Amino acid sequence: MESLVARFDALQEAILTHIESQESTLESQIQYWENIRKENAIMHYARKQGLTKLGLQPLPTLAVTEYNAKQAIQIHLTLQSLLKSPFASERWTLTDVSAELINTSPQNCLKKGGYDVAVWFDNDRQNAMLYTNWDFLYYQDMNEQWHKVKGEVDYDGLYFTDHTGERAYFTLFSSDAQRFSRTGLWTVHFKTQVISSPIVSSTYSSSFDTEEQQLPGPSTSYSEVTEQASPTRRRKPRKSDATSTTSPETEGVRLRRRRREGKSGPGSGETPRKRRRGGGRGGGETELGSAPSPAEVGSRHRQVERQGLSRLGLLQAEARDPPMILLKGTANSLKCWRYRKVNSNCCNFLFMSTVWNWVGDCSHNHSRMLIAFDSTDQRDAFVKHNLFPKLCTYTYGSLNSL
């Protein structure tokens, strides 16, 4: 036991010497975390043997020593991998490779050059929140190749552009706006720049319901925002496809116009609309062309009847099936990722399943997890704004019942 105490004292002396030296090379930081790993391993072993002290040093609980040891091993392996990258020759301080910095958002990334981003909700300086962004972020891709990117800011949140050109958001301002903002608008202040709301539209607020939104028909809130932001992307329909190509807005207006004309009686000169026998529980008749409202998208839990439906009718019927994402990966990574999402007030999904696997599947990434959504738009936003676990793959699908 005396030899264990002597080794423990020697490790603590080496750790204190490194802190006082203030070295800034990656090799020295790797040596520091190797000493931290050995220190926590000794404390964990001593705690398992029933000891509460090593010399004059009180020992934490088994759970704490186990967590600290695993964290030190992870950081030590991460820095050893970084040593093989082109960024190994950069200046790396003890703060740059600290566990606290690695565990801040975005997690499992190395960060340098932090700066504040102030968000004024309702454009009120007294109703503001501070977020931290980074000049440089270092992360590994699925092939364990290191990449260096810049932390960026836009009206929606904080993000970086990965090596594939995709935006990866790690902070969204809308979640805090739901709690602290009355109007749902905010301004972003960072460095010498100010970003204001690009569009002021009542379609973002559910309290301003118009008659057109209550009528069944295609939802036009997204198309309205897109067209206001990029008016040059509109194109005029050609004469040859004027009868077959319509925008969501004109389709919604046409459906509403047909409902009115159907009520005008025989004097209007219109032929009766075609009807088909519905396959629902009521056995009634369903109008062709009645698209699902936004609240109905993803709400169907039955197999769609494919006979007697046009292509448009089939698309509208299938829009009510709840869309899914199937995640494939290791059990531990999926469980940890699910725990973070469930406890981060992330409301942009419907349900998350437990981690499960197929019977007889002995592959490395044999674990599975399902995520259900209210609509395909919600699913696309979830994929855009969330990073999946390392070495994890996903695929789209839908179920007839949840």
UniProtKB/Swiss-Prot annotation:
Molecular functions (GO terms): DNA binding; DNA-binding transcription factor activity; nucleotide binding
Plastid recorded as keyword: no
Mod. after translation: Phosphorylated.
Cell compartments where the protein resides: Host nucleus
Chain positions of cross-link Glycyl lysine isopeptide (Lys-Gly) (interchain with G-Cter in SUMO): K328
Annotated Polar residues bias: 216-231
A GO BP annotation: viral DNA genome replication
Positions of region (Disordered): 207-304
Residue span of region Transactivation domain: 1-202
Region annotation DNA-binding domain: where it falls in the sequence: 321-402
Keywords on record: Activator, DNA replication, DNA-binding, Early protein, Host nucleus, Isopeptide bond, Phosphoprotein, Repressor, Transcription, Transcription regulation, Ubl conjugation
Gene Ontology CC: one annotated term: host cell nucleus
Pfam (any one): PPV_E2_N
Domain of life where this protein originates: Viruses
Protein family: Belongs to the papillomaviridae E2 protein family.
Cited function: Plays a role in the initiation of viral DNA replication. A dimer of E2 interacts with a dimer of E1 in order to improve specificity of E1 DNA binding activity. Once the complex recognizes and binds DNA at specific sites, the E2 dimer is removed from DNA. E2 also regulates viral transcription through binding to the E2RE response element (5'-ACCNNNNNNGGT-3') present in multiple copies in the regulatory regions of the viral genome. Activates or represses transcription depending on E2RE's position with regards to proximal promoter elements including the TATA-box.
HAMAP family: PPV_E2 (MF_04001)
Subunit structure: Binds DNA as homodimer. Interacts with protein E1; this interaction greatly increases E1 DNA-binding activity. Interacts with protein L1; this interaction enhances E2-dependent replication and transcription activation. Interacts with protein L2; this interaction inhibits E2 transcriptional activity but not DNA replication function E2. Interacts with protein E7; this interaction inhibits E7 oncogenic activity. Interacts with host TAF1; this interaction modulates E2-dependent transcriptional regulation. Interacts with host BRD4; this interaction mediates E2 transcriptional activation function.
Name of the protein in its database record: Regulatory protein E2
Lineage: Viruses, Monodnaviria, Shotokuvirae, Cossaviricota, Papovaviricetes
